[in-house]
Amino acid sequence: MVDTAVILMKQEETPSPVDIPWVFTPLIGLPLVERHLMSVRRVGIETAHLICGKSEQTCLEGCLSRWSHDERFPAVNIHGPGTNFVSILPECFLLMDGSHVYHPKLLEDAQLRNDLFIFTNTDKQPIGLGMSTPAFPLGHFPVIPSEDIVIREEMYTMNVHKAENRKSAERLILKTLRKETDGWFSIHLNRPISLAVSRHLVNYSIHPNLITVMTLFLGVLSGVFAAMGTYAFMAAAGIVFHLASIMDGLDGEIARAKFLTSRTGEWLDTISDELTNVAFITGLTIGAYRMSASKTMFWLGIVTLFFYFLTLILLYGHLATGTQSSSLLYFQEQIKTRQFQKRRAAPLITFLQPLVKRDLYGFIFMILAVLGLPHIIIFCWLAAVVITPILFTSHLLKSN
């Protein structure tokens, strides 16, 4: 693995008439140069050398103090015209063309290699990313046929020096903000909406944790509406609950876009999700009782809450003591492992998994609430929270 990157940020074309240097061109809420630096830091690069022209050098040097106090950045060295620093470079370093943006997995792959190579597109044209040595003149990417690596189509790279390419580059970056565990409803309904909102919010100084708190407020509001016990409020509760499900993606998208992900943020998001569910179940229990005057529905709601808390204790207790994760997505990832798929219950659990994804049940519960059927929601939730502890306990016993 390499720990040094050389990023070429030198102006090659006629400067544009804008007030800011091109290296500070905003791209999904971050200046281009900062996006490069945070991207390489995320994959393990500890030191970055920026090669720039005279027009960019002064502006970049003015940022050094701020970057040095932000853990999202590597140690940064700036080299203007006439600077000779080749002698201090390690034997191998990551060489990047700063006028391009790259798919995160391309950088991960590059950082893990120790051999001399260059990434090329399907036409065998260099894309401006590879591993070099001080033996090569800076700005000249090593082209050795046996070490050309053709990138897959989904691994995007795009020149953003040209203004007409930036919108396309932003769309490509937004796609990487999705999660691999997204369900069908999330991919086709929730994410398109949340990404459209995130695209605008990233341009403001809004911390992801603030979005999480706002989402929690919506979740609690859905419970308050449901507890009113009228058809109109029950319908509003379902709509607000699903809206909270859509907004639940915003905090993570903004955090990933601005490299602000943290374990604290993950736990806050997790707690927000569960409090939203508790508020909604509680509201449904009260609202269903008011709508039907049925004590049976009331006690079914109480039993649902009991088993829901039991499920939380089991799942989060395991996360806190047996894993480094703070999200229930950990269990979704475990289901995909080859070891888990060998188990007898694996087909059933794999089949049921989409039903416990928030994007799907949030949509279904919204429809049921709009139809004035809160008791059906309670029955569905009760079935889920009774089955989950049984399957999870069985899984733990077999693991031990």
Question: Which residues fall in each region the model found?
Answer:
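Hydrophobic residues within alpha-helical transmembrane segments
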Residues: 217, 239, 243, 268-271, ...
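Alpha-helical transmembrane segments of multipass membrane proteins
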Residues: 200, 220-224, 366-367
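N-terminal glycine-rich phosphate-binding loop and ensuing alpha1 helix
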Residues: 2-60
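Conserved beta-loop-beta/alpha segment of the NTase-like Rossmann-fold superfamily
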Residues: 61-129
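Basic, amphipathic juxtamembrane/active-site segments
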Residues: 239, 243, 252-295
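Membrane-embedded alpha-helical segments that form the functional core of polytopic membrane enzymes
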Residues: 208-264
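A feature for the membrane-embedded catalytic helix bundles of lipid/isoprenoid biosynthetic enzymes
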Residues: 125-134, 138-198, 272-400
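Residue-level signal for inorganic ion chemistry
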Residues: 33, 99, 207
